[in-house]
Amino acid sequence: MSWDSRPAKETGWFNSDEALYLQLRNQIILGIATDKIRDGDPLPSVRQLADHIGINMHTVNKAYTVLRQEGFVKVDRRRGAVISLDSDKYAALDELHKELGVVLAKAHCKNITRSEVHDLIDEIYDDYFCPSRYGEPKSED
């Protein structure tokens, strides 16, 4: 993967109240979902990425640790962090169930209807799998 050479402040990264390590984690997951990062691709070293985007090395390390725990990255002492997608679908579905439970509870508290949630999910799903945007759709096996 080639990282944007501009500083993080110029790319729009890290413009929210969410913890920086979670924002970095989310950007990497989005990169995987959109095929900008692929299984087997190395990630920059902790030091390189921290220097490049202008954040603390511990923040990058924490993001990589979370990605490893979630089955997106393997860390090898010689190769560094490498994208390695864990194919345990049942564990992924269980994790998704937990995360969506909180999201749906928030939506319910804000009077967002089931139909509106479904429309939003369809819209987001199409952002990742729409042929006109990213070429051929990913396999949905």
Annotate each PLM feature.
Residues 1-42, 48, 94-95, 104-141:
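Extreme N-terminal segment that seeds HTH/winged-HTH DNA-binding domains in transcriptional regulators
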Residues 42-74:
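N-terminal helix-turn-helix
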Residues 87-88, 99, 138-141:
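C-terminal alpha-helical interaction appendages
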